[in-house]
Amino acid sequence: MKRHVIYIPGLGDRSDPLRRLGLLLWRRPGVAVTFVPMRWLDPKETYEEKVVRIQSALLKYEDRNVTLVGESAGGAVAIACYERFRSRVSGAVTVCGMNQGAGAVNPVLYKKNLAFRDAMLAVDKALPNLSSQDRATMLTIYSSNDGVIGKKETVLKGVRSIDIKVPLHMLAIGYVLFLKSSLVTKNI
């Protein structure tokens, strides 16, 4: 059975070409990857428009063997969409994800990006609705040396976690994207 990954990037749309390049390494027999751009830099695009793009990607797959993978700010989107579309999604993985704690984010960042604020509010609302069975199909990959997102915001109760210990947020994401994709593809 083919496994499908829908990759949801974090802030920093200018890095999307690099992300797409890294995702080429994720493709292997039995694994298909779809990159869904978030367009975080578009101040007019709402969180809901981002969710609609993810929903459209989900509708392309007949089976339920789809895992949402969210990176950084995309972690919040992946978890909120997992809760919202549980009937079409088999699991969620976050890579250095901002997975909870809307109040922990600097208000200046929200002022620049209302869609990110709405994603954080959505994930905080979604988390209590996830059962222990739902959480058993989730994985958080984080770095205790991230420097941007703390363990408190990324590690979720009842969800398996892997600490990659790579220094710096972007370096840790790049490590998973280019060198350790197996952390995701072997755990979905």
Regions found by a protein language model. Give the residues of each.
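Glycine-rich His-Gly loop
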Residues: 8-11, 143
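The serine-hydrolase catalytic nucleophile loop
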Residues: 14-21
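Conserved alpha/beta-hydrolase
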Residues: 22-42
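Short, charged, surface-exposed secondary-structure boundary motifs
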Residues: 44, 102-108, 169-177
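C-terminal catalytic-base region of ester-bond hydrolases, centering on the histidine
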Residues: 133-188
